[in-house]
Amino acid sequence: MNIVKDHCKNFKRYGEKRSAPLDSIQVHSIGTAQNSAKAVRDSMDQYNPGGIVHAVVDAETDGLVLELLPDDNLAWADAGYGNQHSYTFEIAESDFMRYKNGGAEYEVTDEEKFLEDIRRGYRNAVDFAAQKCLQFGIQPTAKLPNGLYALYSHNEGRLAGVSSAHVDPEHVWSKIGKTMDDFRRDVEAAMKEQEEGDGAGEERYLVQAGAFRNKENAERLAERLRAAGFEAFVKS
């Protein structure tokens, strides 16, 4: 993957750490007719944006992701649980669509090119989510105390009553026959491939950083280690 750091430093709360331990990854799609991560990033790089996430996955170029915020920063992603608990990212959609009536309804202006964009964005998102799950020690199908999966969509947050009333990204993935269950399965498969590729023929050594009676304290230490660039996970 080509992950490019292009931080939105004009955001008024840039650099502010989330107040809760990171326990999940929240997936969005942008909800506008745009396949360029750069265009999405530029729209968010303002003092008081309508929303801002940690990264944007491109739908125009294979493997391209723009990082907008440091991993440990809070986000303005879903007006709810995701802002303080989740690593959040958007997936660009397509230039070949037109939204109607100010909601999630849209029409496709060029079906072939639209499907190419959505499929490319999906593939990029699978690889990126797999990389972040490995980095944060997140299992996509693990369940959180609120009933959500540890890898969940904005729409799933809405259905669980912990996110704002958006239906992304399933409203565009339905056109390519994909669901969040498919996505989690694909991410788990990509995680396995990435682990095998990174560790093929290598012996690995694990270092324990601490032992805690309180899981929240353990999560805080793990998050500090991740922010410093280490791969960290909590295990009982």
Residue ranges and their predicted role:
Residues 27, 87-89, 151-153:
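Hydrophobic faces of well-ordered beta-strands that scaffold small-molecule active sites
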Residues 35, 63, 76, 97, ...:
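Residue-level signal for secondary-structure boundary sites
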Residues 80-102:
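Short coil-to-beta-strand
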Residues 196-236:
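Solvent-exposed beta-strand motifs enriched in subsets of small alpha/beta binding domains
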